[in-house]
């Protein structure tokens, strides 16, 4: 297939299931990486609108940092303020109602370096100043892996670092949340970290960082039990909530992006269900939220297909539980007015 191509996605068309069900999408990005060879180099308000208005009732969304539109000069620790300024403008345009009723980036999650310890406070204050009404926290990548072919974006044992924990406490003192990415074999470390900073609301991204390609290919008999045990451990920490998504990224090992025609929502639901239902069983719906992770996940399926799949696999839950999964957990955690 043409990797990351709207024409390919259009080969699988379906009517939207339950089009009136309210949804808050708690995880997407905005970027313009025109100089980088990646799928969907440009994903701004027009591109997001094409997805969120493709059939489902997306009431609001949450922008998650992606190191885009940083300031070109000034102190390194403050360059990420540029991303917040950029997204604040897109959010204001969306809130005008000109494009439709969805409030894009109703909450904004930026980037700040907790390894600064207590010195992170002025950075967080600058981020908040750039978006007084929408900035709700930061995301800090903590993924580390010993294999050189696996992308590592943090030092080993960063979650145990005393400065990192001091920085997290500053975050808590300011009433801000912490989105975190890790790999599946780091989940026990995350549980230990969460217990050390019980006042911090931690949002674990992408079902806890499963990895099933490269050095972890053909090792499901080891990887999946390790992941399940890790999910169980982090679920025991009351200050951690979980995002259900990100599974369309190729590193999750499903290879849907290689199909001659995109997967249907029924088949996608069947393949997602064992992982997602396990997560919900451990965390409960009140601590879980369905996410799109667009555009990274867009290499595997369309927005309409993904949320159709989420609706199919969640039919076993009560109306209240489904409201939590699709909308209420996200708006509560990210403090979005409804």
Region locations from a protein language model:
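Short amphipathic alpha-helices and their capping/turn segments at secondary-structure boundaries
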Residues: 9-19, 44-55, 119-134, 188-198, ...
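Active-site gating/metal-coordination segments in enzymes
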Residues: 2-11, 75-186, 192, 208, ...
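Conserved, mostly hydrophobic/aromatic
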Residues: 27, 61, 87, 108, ...
């Amino acid at each position: 297939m043409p990797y990351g191509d709207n024409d390919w996605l259009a080969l699988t068309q379906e009517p939207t299931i339950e089009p009136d069900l309210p949804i808050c999408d708690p995880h997407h990005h905005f970027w313009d990486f025109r100089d980088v060879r990646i799928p969907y180099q440009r994903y701004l308000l027009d591109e997001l609108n094409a997805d969120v208005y493709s059939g489902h009732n997306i009431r609001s969304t949450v922008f998650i940092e992606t190191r885009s539109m940083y300031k070109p000069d000034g102190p390194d620790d403050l360059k990420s303020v540029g991303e917040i300024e950029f997204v604040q403008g897109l959010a204001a345009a969306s809130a005008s109602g000109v494009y439709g009723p969805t409030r894009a980036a109703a909450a904004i999650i930026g980037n700040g370096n907790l390894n600064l310890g207590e010195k992170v406070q002025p950075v967080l204050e600058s981020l908040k100043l750039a978006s007084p009404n929408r900035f709700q926290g930061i995301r800090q990548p903590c993924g580390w892996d010993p294999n050189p072919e696996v992308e590592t974006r943090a030092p080993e044992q960063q979650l145990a670092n005393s400065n990192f924990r001091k920085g997290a406490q500053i975050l808590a003192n300011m009433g801000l949340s912490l989105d975190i990415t890790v790999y599946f074999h780091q989940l026990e470390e995350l549980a230990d970290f969460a217990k050390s900073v019980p006042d911090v609301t931690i949002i674990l991204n992408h079902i806890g960082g499963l990895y099933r390609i490269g050095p972890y290919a053909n090792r499901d008999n080891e990887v999946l039990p390790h992941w399940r045990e890790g999910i169980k451990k982090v679920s025991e920490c009351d200050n951690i909530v979980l995002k259900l998504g990100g599974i369309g990224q190729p590193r999750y090992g499903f290879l849907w992006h290689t199909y001659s025609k995109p997967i249907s929502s029924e088949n996608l639901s069947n393949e997602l269900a064992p992982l997602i239902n396990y997560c919900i069983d451990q965390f409960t719906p009140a601590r879980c939220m369905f996410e799109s992770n667009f555009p990274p996940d867009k290499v595997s399926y369309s927005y309409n297909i993904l949320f159709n799949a989420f609706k199919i696999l969640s039919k076993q839950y009560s109306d209240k539980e489904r409201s939590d999964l699709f909308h209420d957990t996200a708006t509560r955690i990210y403090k979005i007015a409804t």
